[in-house]
């Protein structure tokens, strides 16, 4: 079986993904955090060529296209990319994007020039060989270029499940008895990811926690009713320890050396 067949494809459930992820407070907060990080990134201060690996429905890619960047979106799911293209037309940026239904493992075959900036968000945790994927990202970015990598944090998943009282699940080392279609099956230990990045030829220039507080609220209704204050707190503290390390996701800015 090929790697492309093994890795997760969201064809057939793109609409469910949009409703349950992108349109929720989780998705809104993630978008705001990433856009804040990018607004402070000198690599994106002027229009650039960007590759978005596992772009999904393109929420972040299209926001960058609106800032003047040329963005190539790739994803295993054609359904996701079709939604991205439709949204791009509505925003008037369809001439600034290209969409390709390709797995990460196929991108080296395209003979594209290396990109100054590569994004790979919430992808590694769906792959069977995440360490190999980081090496493949290094091959796609220019030396001296930037990779924005966001991954699902196993430490944070463990912490949240302890808080919820899911002790048996934690004692099974977060092994699912029944798989949940939109829940990543392979959360990653941050120390492993840091090591893989170094071995692949990257230096970590920045680290941000994503959803450092959102998932831990005692009153979950406040995720919606107090969203503005929650976001303000997130943006103020999500680069400081220990909070950065308990974000449900970690966002790393990697410099290719």
Regions found by a protein language model. Give the residues of each.
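Conserved class I S-adenosyl-L-methionine
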Residues: 1-45, 47-54, 59, 63, 91, 146-173
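A C-terminal cap/extension of S-adenosyl-L-methionine-dependent methyltransferases
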Residues: 206-257
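A conserved beta-strand element that flanks and buttresses the S-adenosyl-L-methionine
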Residues: 119
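Class I SAM-dependent methyltransferase SAM/SAH-binding core
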Residues: 59-106
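A short glycine-rich, Lys/Arg-flanked "PGG" loop and its adjoining helix->strand segment in the class I
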Residues: 131-146
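Acceptor-substrate binding/catalytic loop of class I
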Residues: 176-192
């Amino acid at each position: 079986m090929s790697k492309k067949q093994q890795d997760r494809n969201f064809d057939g459930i793109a609409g469910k993904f949009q409703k349950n992820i992108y349109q929720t407070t989780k998705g809104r907060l993630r978008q705001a955090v990433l856009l804040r990080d990018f607004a402070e990134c000198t690599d994106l201060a002027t229009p650039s060529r960007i590759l978005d690996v596992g772009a999904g429905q393109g929420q972040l890619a299209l926001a960058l296209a609106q800032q003047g960047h040329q963005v190539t979106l790739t994803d295993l799911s054609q359904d996701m990319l079709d939604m991205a293209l439709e949204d791009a037309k509505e925003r008037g940026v369809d001439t600034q994007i290209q969409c390709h239904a390709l797995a990460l493992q196929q991108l080296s075959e395209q003979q594209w020039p290396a990109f100054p900036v590569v994004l790979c968000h919430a992808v590694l945790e769906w792959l069977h060989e995440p360490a190999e994927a980081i090496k493949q990202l290094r091959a796609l970015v220019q030396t001296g270029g930037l990779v924005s990598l966001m991954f699902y944090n196993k430490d944070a998943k463990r912490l949240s499940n302890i808080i919820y009282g899911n002790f048996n699940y934690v004692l099974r080392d977060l092994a699912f008895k029944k798989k949940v279609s939109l829940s990543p099956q392979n959360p990653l230990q941050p120390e492993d990811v840091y090591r893989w990045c170094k071995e692949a030829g990257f230096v970590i220039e920045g680290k941000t926690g994503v959803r450092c507080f959102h998932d831990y609220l005692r009153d979950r209704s406040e995720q919606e009713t107090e969203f503005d204050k929650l976001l303000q707190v997130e943006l103020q503290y999500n680069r400081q320890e220990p909070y950065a390390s308990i974000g449900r996701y970690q966002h790393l800015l990697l410099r290719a050396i």
